[in-house]
Amino acid sequence: MFVYGTLRRGQPNWGRLLAAAAERVVAGRLAGVLLLDCGHYPAAVERPGAGEAVGEVVWIRSDAWLATLAGIDHLEGYDPADRDRLYDRVLRSVDTADGPVDCWVYVAGPMLAGSARPAVTGGDWVAYCADQPGAQ
């Protein structure tokens, strides 16, 4: 799974949903997306040539996969039957230092993709948040 926002290590949802299930974590980059600032979380909008999202590829233990996926689906508001869902879960190729890896990634669903939001400068949510006024 590729994570680029609040599910990254050190971010609010890492400990809640991924830390105990993670088997391995490496840095990764997802090309062809524009990362948007949705307030307390980002959304990756698929736009070929638009830029990239900086994040992490997380390998999840097989015995924890289904429960972890269900928890993240819930967090991301992903329900394929809901036309107003916040995110879509799609399989995409993510670049890592060891080469490309096919990963599940949550990209902006119909509701978020059509909204007017500011872009996350540089495509790195963690760095972007650290640069905001009042960041510690």
What does each model-identified segment do?
Residues M1-Q136:
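Glycine-aromatic micro-motifs
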